[in-house]
Amino acid sequence: MSVSYFQERGTPASGDVLSPATTSLGGASRGANALSSRITSVLSASYADLEIRDALETLDTRGVRNTAETRRQIRLDVQKEVIECNGEIVKDFGQVAEQLKRIGTAISSLNSYCADMRSHIAAANKETGPVLEEATGLINQRKQVESKQQILQAFNSHFLISDEEATVLTSTAEPVNEEFFQVLTRVKKIHHDCQVLLGTEDQRLGLEILEQSSKQLNAAFQKLYRWIQREFKTLDLENPQISASVRRSLRVLAERPTLFQSCLDSFAEARESILSDSFHSALTGSASDAEHIATKPIEFQAHDPLRYVGDMLAWVHSTTVSEREALENLFISDGDEIKRSIQEGLESEPWLKDEEAEIFDGRKALSQLVGRDLASVARVLRQRTEQVVQSHDDATLAYKIANLIGFYKGMFAKLLGTDSDVLEVFTTLEASAMRQFRANMRDYVAAVQSDIAVPPQDLSPPDFLDDALQTLKVLAKSYDTSSAGAEDQEQGFQAVLAEALDPFMSGCVNLQKGLQQPDSAVFAINCLFAAKDVLSAFTFASERVEEMEDTISEQVAQLVDYQHEYLLHESGLATLLEALEPITDDEESLKTIPELEPFKRDALVAASQQLDEFLPSALIDAAENLKRLKNRKMIQDITEEAAASFCEDFEVVESKIIAADDLTYDEDKEDEEQEPGLRDLFPRTSGEIRVLLS
């Protein structure tokens, strides 16, 4: 529609330009240029221009048709509409102006009212200002007073205790109960918190409260100390349900190491007396209570020294275990509380602290306390045990008692530690029993040595050695029982061997010196085998057994040499070997063999006959030399070894004879013409010898 619009408008325009009724040429030219510019401007406008698009859309909504009338009136219609719209706007603004006038009037009225109110308020402020200032001051003062009152109440509740609480804390008429410990804990906190007050400029208040709390604490600990003392007098350690208040009291009292130690001292004295009486009752059966009626007194076993000492040691050990368990329940059931309390006490009483002292060890202190409780019992045990040991001259009994004491000593070391005074008593008793054992053994050895004359005819171990070995066997069994599991078990038995075996073996050596071979070696081996048989049953004597085996081997070697020499001399082979010693393997030396005296015809024939006569019974005759040796297999082994050496010597003689015959044999002569050779005179071969001696 817009295209047709521009075309229809262009037609009359063109007509107007060509019309003769137009104005002058200049005016027509300007009009044509203006129209041309207008048309050009319109045609150059883009249809995408928003203004043109809006204008076209407005025309479309009005339903305008493209007619000549419409084109003439459209401008006027638009201007008319604009004027009408402007009129309506002016009318509306007139109403707004009227309303603004009314609002202005209202505002003026309000301003007037506000001015009046300001004047009234200013007058009221002027009249009430001093009253408000005074009220504000009073309110601030009230807040300060309330704040001070709260501070005072907080201070009193924190740093002061009531008279009732002070009575509970310090009065001996009041019981030691949960309330006492609560008040005590509070006073300790007050005492500790006084450090804050001492840090202020005015320390007077802090010093006064510190002094007051110190007095209250001292009085409380004194009350607690006396209460514990009373409780200890009636305390039954055998009762597993020990009062929890006693344990708690001890833990708290530990904060005062001096009082705590004093309490322990009195407790130890009381327990020492009680345990001493109990031990005396167990020994004599003098107890009046029903607990010991069914138990026989230990002294009923006095006729059996070992059982008597064992029963006493068993009673002491059982009592020690019970005492330690009871004291653990009393002092250590709460863990390390007592240790921490003592450390706190030492910090609060630094003058009691030794710089070189070890850190408090609860277990060690407990062991020391148990040791103190058993001091009197240990003294009685020592007296009675020493009396038993010294009143018997039986070395075996003394050693068994020493081993028994050593066994219990190890158990007490685990219970009380190696530094316990009770352990020193056991060490002394063990040493005393061992001294008695050594003294008894030396007396016995001296008595035996005075009776020693000659060894038995059958070269068997002498009676004193048999008796000593029986005693040694008993001692070894006792040692094995008492020292089971000990690391130095073998080393510890050396002292027993030195006293119970070595002197008797030395006596056997002295007897051996008066014997000739083979009796000397046979006697030594018999004695060594007897001792070895006893010691082999005990692993802790393995070193001594090895030494004996080495000595037996040396003696066996001597017997082998003796048997070897016997075979050589009895067979006549010794003479031949002696003659062949200077002969070497060169031909000249070998040729001289027939000229040697033992190898001459008659002598060699005699030697051959002697050998033939010896061989059938050689082994029997040789074994007869060792018939008193107790080990039959050893007799056979020694003889066979000597026979083997004899065969080797015979092979030497045989080889020399054969070599000499080979050098003297004349191949040019007939066999009948040859002189008899050495081999012919001495026909035995090494093979035959080995068969006959096997």
Swiss-Prot record:
What InterPro entries has UniProt attached to this entry? Answer: COG6, COG6_C, COG6_N
Report the GO terms under cellular component: Golgi membrane; Golgi transport complex
Question: Membrane topology type, per the record?
Answer: Peripheral membrane protein
State its location(s). Answer: Golgi apparatus membrane
Major location (coarse): Golgi
Q: Where is this region: Disordered?
A: 1-20
Q: Which UniProt keywords apply?
A: Golgi apparatus, Membrane, Protein transport, Transport
Alphabetical GO biological process terms: intra-Golgi vesicle-mediated transport; protein transport
What role does this protein play?
Acts as a component of the peripheral membrane COG complex that is involved in intra-Golgi protein trafficking. COG is located at the cis-Golgi, and regulates tethering of retrograde intra-Golgi vesicles and possibly a number of other membrane trafficking events.
What is the similarity comment for this entry? Belongs to the COG6 family.
Write the protein's name.
Conserved oligomeric Golgi complex subunit 6
Its gene is: COG6
